[in-house]
Curated annotation (Swiss-Prot):
Alphabetical list of InterPro entries matching this protein: NA-bd_OB-fold, RNA-binding_domain_S1_IF1, S1_domain, TIF_IF1
Identification of the protein by name: Translation initiation factor IF-1
Subunit composition and interactions: Component of the 30S ribosomal translation pre-initiation complex which assembles on the 30S ribosome in the order IF-2 and IF-3, IF-1 and N-formylmethionyl-tRNA(fMet); mRNA recruitment can occur at any time during PIC assembly.
PANTHER family membership: TRANSLATION INITIATION FACTOR IF-1, CHLOROPLASTIC (PTHR33370:SF1)
SUPFAM superfamilies per record: Nucleic acid-binding proteins
Keywords: Cytoplasm, Initiation factor, Protein biosynthesis, RNA-binding, rRNA-binding
The encoding gene: infA
Amino acid sequence: MAKEGAIEVEGRIVEPLPNAMFRVELDNGHKVLAHISGKMRQHYIRILPEDRVVVELSPYDLTRGRIVYRYK
């Protein structure tokens, strides 16, 4: 369910940062800075270190992303 042109990749939360930002290590080894999507904030979905997540990356800036799903 990625936006038009967005890239969806899986990763693992490495560390929480201020302002609902997270450092995420992708499965390919890269580390990106990601924030929580609006729907996840609305539904109070908590994200903890070591959680597996799906991150949506923009093709314009591959170092930043949006967390769109947390695996149970």
